[in-house]
Amino acid sequence: MNADTIHYLNLFLGTGTILLQVFCVVTLFILFFNFKKNKKNVFLDFIDKHFLILVFLISLSATIFPLVYSEIIRFVPCYLCWWQRVFMFPLVLIFGVALWDKDRKVIRYVLPLLCAGFLASVYQNFFYYFGENSNLPCDASGVSCYQHVVSVFGGYISIPMMALTVFFSLLTLLAVAHFYKKEI
C-alpha cells in the first residue's frame, strides 16, 4: 500500500473511532436518564432490537482492520496489542453464532472477554499517553508499545485508542441490551 492509501485509511478509522466515542457517550447518557424515568426511547429501542447485528459488525471490523494493518500494511503489533487481539478475535465467532441463533444471552459468555480486553486496553492507553518512561512489556522483536504508528487528529487517535473505543462500545451495547427496559 502506498502512503496516501494508509493516510486515508488512518483518517477513515480515526473518524470512525471518534464517531463511535460520541455514540457511546450519547447512548450512556440516554440510558442513564432513561433508567431513572423508565420511559420508552426510540434510540434505545433501535439499539436493543439490533443489538446482535451491531456487536457483530463492530467486532468484525475490530478484527479485520488490525489484520489489514499487520498483514497487508506490515505494521508489527506490540505485546499488548496481541493480548487485545486474544480477547477481541473470538468475539466475532461468538457474536456471529449468537446472531445466527438470535441468542441475546450471549452477554454472559462475552463479558469476561470484553472486560479483560478493556482492562488491557486501558492499561496500554494509560502508558501510551502518560507513561513514556514506564517498563511496559514489549516483545523480543523490539516492537515498542509506545510506537506511534497511527497518530490522527493531533495524536488523540492511535491504535490503542481505537482498541479501547471498540471494547468500550461493545460494553456500552451490552449495557443497553441488559439494562434497558422497554416498559412505559
Feature annotation, model-predicted:
Residues 1-77, 88-91, 95, 99-184:
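Secretory/periplasmic and organellar redox-cofactor proteins
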Residues 84:
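Cys/His-rich metal-chelating microdomains
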